[in-house]
UniProtKB/Swiss-Prot annotation:
Belongs to the QueC family. GO terms for molecular function: ATP binding; ligase activity, forming carbon-nitrogen bonds; zinc ion binding. Zn(2+) binds at residues 195, 203, 206, 209. HAMAP family: QueC (MF_01633). PANTHER family: 7-CYANO-7-DEAZAGUANINE SYNTHASE (PTHR42914:SF1). It catalyses: 7-carboxy-7-deazaguanine + NH4(+) + ATP = 7-cyano-7-deazaguanine + ADP + phosphate + H2O + H(+). It is an enzyme of class 6 (ligase). Its EC number is 6.3.4.20. It comes from Thermosynechococcus vestitus (strain NIES-2133 / IAM M-273 / BP-1). The lineage of its organism: Bacteria, Bacillati, Cyanobacteriota, Cyanophyceae, Acaryochloridales. Its cofactor is Zn(2+). This is 7-cyano-7-deazaguanine synthase.
Length: 233
């Protein structure tokens, strides 16, 4: 009897994590989606995460409340910090942006590790990618390698020689590559959400919107999300 391997998939509801989930599902994993209600200004992404998890047919979808607004430190968790708007890609990659949430992936990957170990899952899947690690310190390959060592040393499974693997299938990909990949897996882009604002329409001006719109345009595709504005890219 063949046992389907369990996998925990970190799911925000955006392009990247949705592609990772549909990929894991296509590879035959029994997928357990994990999302966080962490006080993000764009709580609309949680609606997207629920829709994507349902579309993918996950075994379980956990949404963990975690109030990172208690200390802020990011434009995503502190409403007094303005979101960057109307920036080009070159400007975005010059420094760590104010949308970086302090230690967010360390927190998320730690919770995912606990969830995976409790499930006796063999892997945690996360959608970090090349565009992210140009700006975010907790999306870079050396960071993932360090967290993999934490997974090996900090768990019963790891100490017994079967560490839970951190799977990063998008690590070397750009947004255009990710959209191509997700398209092949049938990701319903209209159900995803990338915008840092919290309306029923994406703003079209934040970094996340501009990266997404530029990638769809480069591929000659129409992004099915409704946008408040369609700025020149």
């Amino acid at each position: 009897m063949v046992t389907t391997q369990k996998a925990v998939v970190l799911l925000s509801g955006g392009l990247d994590s949705s592609t990772v989930l549909f990929r894991a599902k296509a590879l035959g994993y029994a997928c357990y989606a994990l999302s966080f209600d962490y006080g993000q200004r764009h709580r609309r992404e949680l609606e997207a995460a629920i829709a994507i998890a349902t579309s993918a047919g996950v075994v379980e979808h956990q949404i963990l409340p975690l109030n990172l607004r208690l200390w802020g430190g990011s434009a995503l968790t502190d409403l007094s910090i303005d979101l960057p708007r109307d920036r080009d890609l070159a400007t975005m990659s010059q420094e760590i942006p104010v949308t970086y949430v302090p230690a967010r992936n360390t927190i998320f990957l730690s919770v995912a590790l606990a969830y995976a170990e409790a499930l006796e899952a063999r892997s945690v899947h996360i959608g970090v990618n090349a565009l992210d690690y140009s700006g975010y310190p907790d999306c870079r390959p050396d960071y993932i390698a360090a967290m993999q060592e934490v997974y090996r040393l900090g768990t019963k499974q790891g100490r017994e020689g079967q560490p839970i693997e951190i799977v990063t299938p998008l690590i070397d990909l750009h947004k255009t590559d990710i959209i191509r990949l997700g398209h092949g897996y049938g990701v319903p882009w209209e159900k995803t959400w990338s915008c840092y604002s919290d309306g029923q329409q994406a703003c079209g001006r934040c970094d996340a919107c501009r990266l997404r719109l530029a990638a769809f345009a480069e591929l000659g595709l129409v992004d099915p999300l409704p946008y408040a504005v369609h700025p020149p890219l």
